[in-house]
């Protein structure tokens, strides 16, 4: 039962819980960038050590899986922020509305989109290009590389579509 004074306590408890989830997701999302870079370095090391360009096909798979995870976390981070902005439970909590109104937000989001595309899509496409320019490869690997290129294109499209929806 809610009594006088209790709604503010409930709103504060909800806010703390939601913000804790958002912070956890931000940490996960940020760490995914580092994990991706390490995974790319590992795949390139294996490719170089094995003297086989076929291992380059690991890069798009890794960046695709981690990119989707990154995008899903980013979506939830944005959804939490939107919820807190649109359902203000406590007076005086202006950060959630003031921060997104920053006039440089659009340029920051554009730069972030470019970084995301290079990290999660460009690196995979670079590996695929190196694979395609190598000596002739078995048809099954070529077919796999085409599927990876399509999947990477879909991921890039999702990053762009999502950025357009949230940058406004």
Describe each PLM feature range:
Residues 117-132, 142-160:
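Hydrophobic core of alpha-helical transmembrane segments in multi-pass integral membrane proteins
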Residues 41-48, 66-72:
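Membrane-helix exit/interface motif
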Residues 54, 59-105, 156-168:
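Inner-leaflet juxtamembrane helices
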Residues 26, 97-124:
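Loop-to-transmembrane boundary segments
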Residues 50, 131-139, 160-167:
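Transmembrane helix-loop junctions in multipass membrane proteins, especially transporters and channels
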Residues 1-43, 159-168:
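Cytosolic-side membrane-entry/anchor segment at the start of a transmembrane helix
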Residues 37-44, 61-63, 122-130:
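Hydrophobic, membrane-inserted alpha-helices
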